[in-house]
Each structure stands twice: as structure tokens, then as C-alpha cells.
């Protein structure tokens, strides 16, 4: 294609949006590499320590949108120490020095300080979008800087962050000239909200499509907000407690009927279930419903709400819905594509809420289902075989049995055959999480049949090193492998070091890996960062005559092109 001018090729590249496809076309020839270099504006980095910002900017000098991830995924389950790292400040400093025209920044599991938010807000004139997911380290003072200084802000999306609320006045820092907001999500904030400032901001934002409120926004304020913004598509309700005969409730009911654009509903952080009927008139339009934080909504009130939601494609719910409730979902929501069922009783002291019966019902009634996360207290091989037959289009299948090592509760057999049926039937499966009593046999099935698998999470599973080897040898597209409390050791770790060159990362905690094995791995694979995370009192592994047999608590290894990171805390030993 050398006879095409560069301008034509660049225009064609503009239609290639997949990061994987952009990477592939940059490898075709030097000319395409150069064109792709200067035309790529969006970059995704799955590990902030795999590259440094200076090298990124040399590679893509016209960067406008950056997505950056920090801590490993198991940080979501408190398996990564709080002070491990993942600091965004060095990235923002480098971006500011380069004077790149950054417009969008998306961060996940990173440490974000007020200083970094202040610098971000003052360094990029056309900055438009900030999305923070599961981040920590900042306060509402940092949010105030973003509000005050980002004059073209379109999206401020705060999802499940740990934020210190110094005052509830940060919303008043948006200037009166700010009319560009499309997304405003502060549901994770715990403190008070300046309702006057919020209502004024919403009223002057004609393009606002997504609004998610915290529990400090009461029902009467919600009614006023929705009256100002009937164009809202995605609504997150905060506090929802009122008498259904109250004036506030009646006003909300009248306003909601006019919100014909609503397609997504979430929140209800504090709710009076009998008030849900106010939303029934618009439920027939909903495609997404997230009640994973609505612990007070259950029973008949929940069932009635779902029965009105016939177009749902995405449902996040608590397991208090029960098997009978899932049967209602199955009979009502024929367009359902994604289901997540979260535990309402993490201590496991209550009665079994959902079982294999609910999962089978969903698989039979929702033929378009392709993604599931299902927390339950029991499962059977027969149920998993049925699910595999009913839903062969799964791309994500995550099953968490809350009691580790629990077998098929009918036959007392391992769940190998059930998960084997899933990987055999679901040819496009890319993400899989296992639980229950499992032997090496299930990993043989995974290695043989899960040809498209990119991420695998293992807990309390397997018999020997063979199990891990089956996966490493068979799953050619594996990117992330995370293992905890399983009997895999040095033999599996060291069998094929070259495999890690094509993977993004490997996490192993409470396994049989030794310090000696980790050192040998580091020697064989200098392109890897091999991190030993040790939280004992000495903050160091003991280096003595027995170190070869000393097990490591946590191993995290990942590819890098910039060598060892410089911000590791004392309890992280980088080999």
C-alpha cells in the first residue's frame, strides 16, 4: 500500500479504534509505525509500572486520552497491601512537562493525591474527562480544584473510591460558566452535599446525561433535580426514604413520568421499598439496573420492579433476590446480556440466598446472556453442564462459591466436569473465575479447550504443579493469571519462563512458591519485574541457609520495558 499517500493511510487508521488492532497495524512496516505513532490519541496501559510516562510520550506525542491501571486485581479483595504503590503523580508531572494536549484521564486502583488533581486541573487547558475507579489518597479539596479549573469539563465520574470529605462545598467550586457537563457521579462520597450548588449546576447543564448521587441527596432534592434535567439517561438515586403519601414522593412520581429518556437506574443507597412504584412507569425503557448497593430493596417490592423491566440487558443485584426472584428475571428479561449477583451476607451466617437452581433458570430464560458473576453457597456439576448447553456464548464466566473447597453438594464430587463443560461449550470465553472443590483435571480441560481465555482467577484449587502447567501450556492467549491458596510451586513457575513474555502479569499468594524459585525466575527473565511482597515484622525475607525452602507470601510478576520501579515500599522486594 505504499502508493497511498500518508494522509489517506492516516484517515483509514482513524477508523481503527481497538487498541489491539492499532498495535498490530503499527508492526506492518516503518511507514505505518510512524503514521500510527502520530495519529494515535487514545492509549491504554494495563500496568502503570510496565512503562514510564517519558517513554510513552516519546512513542505517542499526540496523546489526548490515557487509561492507566495501578494495583493488581486482587487488591479488590484486600490481598494487596495498602501502601504497595500505583502513584499517579509522576505520570501527571511528566504529562504536564511535555505539554501534551491531554483531554481524558481514566485511572483504576491508583493512588491519587490532591496535589496530583491540582496539577492536572491547571496543566491542560482543554481537559474534559476524569474517571476514577477504586482509587484512593485524595479528598474533596482535589475535586474542588478540578471543578474550579477545568473549564471544559464534560465528565467527572467517581466510582467506588476512598475519598476523605473535608467539606461538602466542592460542588460550589464549579464556575457559573460551566455548562458542559455530560456525566456527574459522586455516589461514593460519604459527606454532606451542597444541594443549592448541585441544583444550580444541573440546571445549567443541558447536555447532562448521567447523574449519580450520594446518600446525602434526599428525595425532595431528587425531584427538583429531575425536573431540571428530564433528559437524564443514567440516574443513580441516593437517599430514597419517604412516606408514599408525602408531597415529595408525589412530586417525584409526577417528574419521573416525564423522564422518558431514562435507560439506566442505580443506587437506592438508603431506600423505602414501598416508594419504588414511582419508577414503575419508566421501567419499560430501562436497559440497565444496578441494585447491588440497595440492601433494603428485596422481596415483593424488588420482584414488582423487575417485572416492569422487560428490556433489561444488564442487571446487578444482591443474592437476597433468591432463586425465585431469579426465575422472575429469567421469565421477564429476555434481552439480558450481563448478570451480576453479589453476596448480601458476606459472613455467611444467613440462609442460602441463591443456588444452582437460580443459575439454571437464568441460563434457560435468557438466551442472550454472555457475561455472569454469580456468588452462591452451593453448586452442582449437573447445573453447570446445563448452563453450558443453554448459554454457549459466554465471554465472561465468574462463579464464586462462598465456602472454599465445597464439592458438588449432591454427589460430593469435585466440580471439574461442570467447569469442563463451560470451557468446552463456550468457545469465545475470555475471562474465567473458578471456585469449589477442584482437582488438576479441571485445569487440563481449561488448557485443552479455553483457546481464547485471557484472564483466569483461581482460589483454593488444584492438586499438583501439573494443574498450573496445563493452563500455561494450553492457553496461548492468556494475559493475566491470578492464583491464591493453591498448591502450585516452583516447578510450575519455572517450567516455561518464555510464556511470561506474552502475558501481562502473574499473581500467586499463599501458594508453594519459594524465594529460591523466584530468584531463579528473575535470573532467567530479566524483562520481568519479580516482586516479593512480605508483610512480616522484618519487612524482609530472611536471607539465611534455609532461604531456598522459604515460601513467599505473595509473588507478583509482570512485563516491563523500563526495569525496576523506584517507589517500592520496604515490604516489597524486587528481584
Swiss-Prot record:
Compartment annotation: Nucleus
Biological processes per GO annotation: auxin-activated signaling pathway; defense response; pollen maturation; protein ubiquitination; stamen development
Job of this protein: Component of SCF(ASK-cullin-F-box) E3 ubiquitin ligase complexes, which may mediate the ubiquitination and subsequent proteasomal degradation of target proteins. Confers sensitivity to the virulent bacterial pathogen P.syringae. Auxin receptor that mediates Aux/IAA proteins proteasomal degradation and auxin-regulated transcription. Involved in embryogenesis regulation by auxin.
Pfam families registered for this protein in UniProt: F-box_5, LRR_6, Transp_inhibit
Taxon lineage: Eukaryota, Viridiplantae, Streptophyta, Embryophyta, Tracheophyta
Keyword Nucleus appears in the UniProt entry: yes
GO cellular component, one term: plant-type vacuole
Keyword Nucleus attributed: yes
Free-text note regarding domains: The F-box is necessary for the interaction with SKP1.
Start and end residues of each F-box domain: 1-47
Induction: Repressed by miR393a (microRNA) in response to flg-22 (flagellin-derived peptide 22).
Top-level taxon of origin: Eukaryota
Keyword annotations: Auxin signaling pathway, Developmental protein, Nucleus, Plant defense, Ubl conjugation pathway
Binding-site list for 1D-myo-inositol hexakisphosphate: 69, 108-109, 340, 396-398, 431, 479-480, 504
Site (Interaction with auxin-responsive proteins): 134, 160, 375, 484
Name listed for the protein in its UniProt record: Protein AUXIN SIGNALING F-BOX 2
Tissue distribution: Ubiquitous, with higher levels in seedlings.
Organism: Arabidopsis thaliana
GO molecular function list: auxin binding; inositol hexakisphosphate binding
Pathway the protein takes part in: Protein modification; protein ubiquitination
Alphabetized InterPro entries for the sequence: COI1_F-box, F-box_dom, Leu-rich_rpt, Leu-rich_rpt_Cys-con_subtyp, LRR_dom_sf, Transp_inhibit
Assembly: Part of a SCF (SKP1-cullin-F-box) protein ligase complex. Interacts with Aux/IAA proteins (IAA7) in an auxin-dependent manner.
Region (Interaction with auxin-responsive proteins): 76-77, 343-348, 400-404, 459-460
SUPFAM superfamilies according to UniProt: RNI-like (SSF52047)
Amino acid at each position: 500500500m505504499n502508493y497511498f499517500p500518508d494522509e489517506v493511510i492516516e484517515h483509514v487508521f482513524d477508523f481503527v479504534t481497538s487498541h489491539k488492532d492499532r498495535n498490530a497495524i503499527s508492526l506492518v512496516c516503518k511507514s505505518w509505525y510512524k503514521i500510527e505513532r502520530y495519529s494515535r490519541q487514545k492509549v491504554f496501559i494495563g500496568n502503570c509500572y510496565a512503562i514510564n510516562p517519558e517513554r510513552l510520550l516519546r512513542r505517542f506525542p499526540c496523546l489526548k486520552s490515557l487509561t492507566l491501571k495501578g494495583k493488581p486485581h486482587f487488591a479488590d479483595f484486600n490481598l494487596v497491601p495498602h501502601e504497595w504503590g500505583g502513584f499517579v503523580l509522576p505520570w501527571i508531572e511528566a504529562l504536564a512537562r511535555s505539554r501534551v494536549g491531554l483531554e481524558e484521564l481514566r485511572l483504576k486502583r491508583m493512588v491519587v493525591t490532591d496535589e496530583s488533581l491540582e496539577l492536572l486541573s491547571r496543566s491542560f487547558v482543554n481537559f474534559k474527562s476524569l474517571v476514577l475507579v477504586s482509587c484512593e489518597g485524595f479528598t474533596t479539596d482535589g475535586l474542588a480544584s478540578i471543578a474550579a479549573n477545568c473549564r471544559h469539563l464534560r465528565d467527572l465520574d467517581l466510582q467506588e473510591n476512598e475519598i476523605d470529605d473535608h467539606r461538602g462545598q466542592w460542588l460550589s467550586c464549579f464556575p457559573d460558566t460551566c455548562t458542559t457537563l455530560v456525566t456527574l457521579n459522586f455516589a461514593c462520597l460519604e459527606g454532606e452535599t451542597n444541594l443549592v450548588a448541585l441544583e444550580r449546576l444541573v440546571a445549567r447543564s443541558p447536555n447532562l446525561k448521567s447523574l449519580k448521587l450520594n446518600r446525602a441527596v434526599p428525595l425532595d432534592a431528587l425531584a427538583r433535580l429531575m425536573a431540571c434535567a428530564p433528559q437524564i439517561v443514567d440516574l443513580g438515586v441516593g437517599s430514597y426514604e419517604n412516606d408514599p403519601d408525602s408531597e415529595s414522593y408525589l412530586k417525584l412520581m409526577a417528574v419521573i413520568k416525564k423522564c422518558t429518556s431514562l435507560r439506566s437506574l442505580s443506587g437506592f443507597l438508603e431506600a423505602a421499598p414501598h416508594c419504588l412504584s414511582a419508577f414503575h412507569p419508566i421501567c419499560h425503557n430501562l436497559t440497565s439496573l444496578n441494585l447491588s448497593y440497595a440492601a433494603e430493596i428485596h422481596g415483593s417490592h424488588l420482584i414488582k420492579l423487575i417485572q416492569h423491566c422487560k428490556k433489561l440487558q444488564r442487571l446487578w443485584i444482591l443474592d437476597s433476590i433468591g432463586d425465585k426472584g431469579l426465575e422472575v428475571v429469567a421469565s421477564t428479561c429476555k434481552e439480558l446480556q450481563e448478570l451480576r449477583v453479589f453476596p448480601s451476607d458476606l459472613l455467611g451466617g444467613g440462609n442460602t440466598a441463591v443456588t444452582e437452581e437460580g443459575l439454571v433458570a437464568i441460563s434457560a430464560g435468557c438466551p442472550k446472556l454472555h457475561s455472569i458473576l454469580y456468588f452462591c453457597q452451593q453448586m452442582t456439576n449437573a447445573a453447570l453442564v446445563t448452563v453450558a448447553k443453554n448459554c454457549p456464548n459466554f465471554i465472561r464466566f465468574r462463579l464464586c462459591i462462598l465456602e472454599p473447597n465445597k464439592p458438588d453438594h449432591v454427589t460430593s464430587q469435585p466440580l471439574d466436569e461442570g467447569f469442563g463443560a463451560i470451557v468446552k461449550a463456550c468457545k469465545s470465553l475470555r475471562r474465567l473465575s473458578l471456585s469449589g472443590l477442584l482437582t488438576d483435571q479441571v485445569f487440563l480441560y481449561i488448557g485443552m479447550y479455553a483457546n481464547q481465555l485471557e484472564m483466569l482467577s483461581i482460589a483454593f484449587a488444584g492438586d499438583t504443579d501439573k494443574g498450573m502447567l496445563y493452563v500455561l501450556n494450553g492457553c496461548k492467549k492468556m494475559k493475566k493469571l491470578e492464583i491464591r491458596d493453591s498448591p502450585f510451586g516452583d516447578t510450575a513457575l519455572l517450567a516455561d519462563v518464555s510464556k511470561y513474555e506474552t502475558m501481562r502479569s502473574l499473581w500467586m499468594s499463599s501458594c508453594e512458591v519459594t524465594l529460591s524459585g523466584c530468584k531463579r525466575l528473575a535470573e532467567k527473565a530479566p524483562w520481568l519485574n519479580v516482586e516479593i511482597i512480605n508483610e512480616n515484622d522484618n519487612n524482609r525475607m530472611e536471607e539465611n541457609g534455609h532461604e531456598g525452602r522459604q515460601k513467599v507470601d505473595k509473588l507478583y510478576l509482570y512485563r516491563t520495558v523500563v526495569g525496576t520501579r523506584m517507589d517500592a515500599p520496604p515490604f516489597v522486594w524486587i528481584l
